[in-house]
Structures are given as structure tokens and as C-alpha cells.
A protein has these predicted regions:
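Acidic/histidine-rich helix-loop elements
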Residues: 17-28, 53-57, 88-97
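Short glycine-rich His-centered loop
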Residues: 2-25
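Glycine-rich beta-strand-to-loop/alpha-helix junction loops that act as flexible
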Residues: 9-11, 55, 82-84
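Alpha-helical cap/lid subdomain in secreted, periplasmic
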Residues: 2, 32-46, 61-129
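Residue-level recognition of beta-strand->loop/alpha-helix junctions
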Residues: 51-53, 125
Length: 129
């Protein structure tokens, strides 16, 4: 049976109330439903799902966690939802993160992932209602 390790990373959307002492607890958000879908769609694959999303995280936090919470885990697939905390909480104050810094941090994350896994694919499509 083929094994695939899928890592969910990001902010509160990924955290979704997960238990921090159990990285295999997927909370009550999209990681839980994505895992259920994938298990049903691909029953011949032995998935290991890991959720390390942390509510309130920004791109700079993920950069700080790259080694321990991305590279050392050696995932086959990575799902990242991050960015809203970089802009939402600071839209009206002086701690706003400039676009170029946000972009640089995001590129650091993506490059680290793309160089640490054997296959890379990036989808920037957003859901359409």
C-alpha cells in the first residue's frame, strides 16, 4: 500500500480547534474534511495527516517554523492557508506588513517546501461560489 504524508499548515483556518499535543488531530475545519474526502477517494493509499496550523500565525511565524514544522517532517504533500493575519489585524495601524515583505516571506516558505519535497505543485485558485 502506498503511503503519503500530508501536512496542513497555516493560521486559524488550518488550526480549526485542533489539539496542540496531537499533531494528527485535525480540528473541525478544512483539514478534517479534506482528510475524510481523500481517504474515501483513494482507499488504496495509507495517508498520514498532520495538522500544525496555529491560530493567529502570520507568514513570519511560518518562516520561523520552517525547519521543525515543515522540512523535518518530510511531507509528501503540503497544504498552506496563511496570510489573512498579515493584513487583517493591522489594516488600520502602523504595524501593517508591506506587500514586498509579505511576498518575500511567502516565497521563503514556498521555496523551502519546493526544495524539500520531490514533487511540487502550487495552486493559487480561490474557491468560487
Amino acid at each position: 500500500m502506498k503511503k503519503i504524508k500530508l501536512l496542513f499548515q497555516g493560521d486559524s483556518i488550518t488550526d480549526a480547534g485542533r489539539e496542540y499535543n496531537d499533531c494528527h488531530n485535525l480540528g473541525e475545519g478544512y483539514p478534517k474534511y479534506a482528510a475524510k474526502y481523500l481517504k474515501n477517494k483513494f482507499p488504496d493509499i495509507d495517508f498520514e495527516f498532520i495538522d500544525l496550523g496555529i491560530s493567529g500565525n502570520q507568514t513570519k511565524d511560518l518562516v520561523g517554523r520552517l525547519q521543525n514544522d515543515f522540512i523535518d517532517i518530510k511531507p509528501d504533500i503540503v497544504s498552506i492557508l496563511i496570510g489573512i493575519n498579515d493584513v487583517w489585524h493591522h489594516a488600520d495601524d502602523k504595524s501593517w506588513i508591506p506587500n514586498d515583505i509579505f511576498e518575500d516571506q511567502y516565497r521563503i516558505i514556498l521555496n523551502a517546501i519546493l526544495f524539500s519535497i520531490t514533487q511540487g505543485y502550487m495552486n493559487t485558485d480561490t474557491a468560487k461560489c
